[in-house]
Amino acid sequence: MPLESVKSTRNTQSYAIWLMPHGNDKHQLKAKIQSLGSDFDGPYFEPHVTLVAGFLGEEKKLLKKTETISKKISPFIIVFDGVAYFNEFFRSLFLKVKFSSQLGAARVLACTELEWKENKYLPHLSLIYGDYTVKQKGKMILSLDSVIDSFSVNNIYLAHNDEINLKWKVIK
C-alpha cells in the first residue's frame, strides 16, 4: 500500500502509547532497525510495540493520562512469535507479538482512559517502515540472524507521531 493511501486513513499528526524495551533488548532491536533502515533506505524509529495510536489531544493532559495508565498497569512480558510482513508502509516487516491477558488488560485500560474506541489491534514490533517488494522483504528476513524473543514492560510512553515527515518523538 503506498504511503499516500496509508496517510489518508490515519491521523498523520497524532499521539500514541508505546511499550518499549530497555537495556540490551533495546540495544539489539535498535541496531536491527538501524541496519535495515540503512540497507533498505527506511526511516529510523525507536523500537516499540504500540498499545494505542492515532489519538489527539493537549499534550499536558495526555501526559497526565499516560501517567495514570502507567500506575494502573502491572509489569508484564511481551513475547514475540516470529517475523511477518504486510503490504503496508507501517507494517512492512515486523515481529509478531503473542497476545496475552496482561497485554489485553493494558490495551483496554489505555483505551478507556483515553476514551479511544478503535477496536482493531494487531500488536507487533516493526523492524522497518516502507514500501518493499516480497523479494526485498525476503532479503530482510534472511538478514535477521537472531532477534530477541521477549522484553519486559515496566513503563509506558507517550509518543508524538509525525507520519508526514516520518518522525517519531518519545515525549515521556
Which stretches of residues belong to each language-model region?
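Basic, often amphipathic N-terminal segments
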Residues: 1-77, 97-152, 164-172
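Short, basic/glycine-rich phosphate-binding loops at helix/coil junctions
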Residues: 84-94
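Glycine-rich beta-strand-turn "strand-cap" elements at beta-sheet edges
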Residues: 88, 154-166
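Short beta-strand element of the conserved SAM-dependent methyltransferase core
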Residues: 95-97, 158
